[in-house]
Amino acid sequence: ALKVAGGAKTGAAEWVALDMDQVQISARVAAAAVGATQFCRPEDLERIAATLYVALTCEDVDNAANTSGRGAVMAVELDDEPTVKYVAAAGKNAPIEIQPNVATGAAGVTGFKGADNLADGPDGKLWIVEDNAFSDIWVLDPQSGDANDDGYPDGMHLFASLKDKPAEGTGIYFGKDPHTLYVNVQHSGTGNDKTMAITRQHKGNNQGNSNTTTAVQGH
């Protein structure tokens, strides 16, 4: 289990062994017994090179006691002496989501909320899909700059949003073709759960490229 020094959530850390007999009964009890650090709903892991990324669906990066946060992605550097830091969070390197106000007509803001599933992109970027309504797909470039020196990479961008509000994008991954991203859609408001392939379309004749989306399986 991961244990961050000094009872903090970020910084120097260590891996501590668990009582495997207790793990078979309750992994949470086993982790608590060795003082492992608690995070809010770690939903998915993705390793890129020597960094392990973790989607924390309800993490609050500013208030460790809050279990209803907007979510975040953290990175664990897998060195002999591991370190932990947050790399994606609303209000840091992504907008805070604001729902549109029907009464006033005020427009909403598409923000980052409920990080849920992760994928390693072909160029080393981290792809993130939300458990949110509406569910969005974001792309984080871990190697991008940090202009305000807050520890969060500046290269965090919105890639796509589902129009089906109840639906949840999940199971995001790249196949053998580095230009094709697969996204599973569940809990669709239309009852049409599906797997979608988002592919770069090469137009030729110097007309550039565009993204196309195809449902490769559904019901």
Predicted features by range, described:
Residues 1-219:
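Sequence/structural signature of beta-propeller domains
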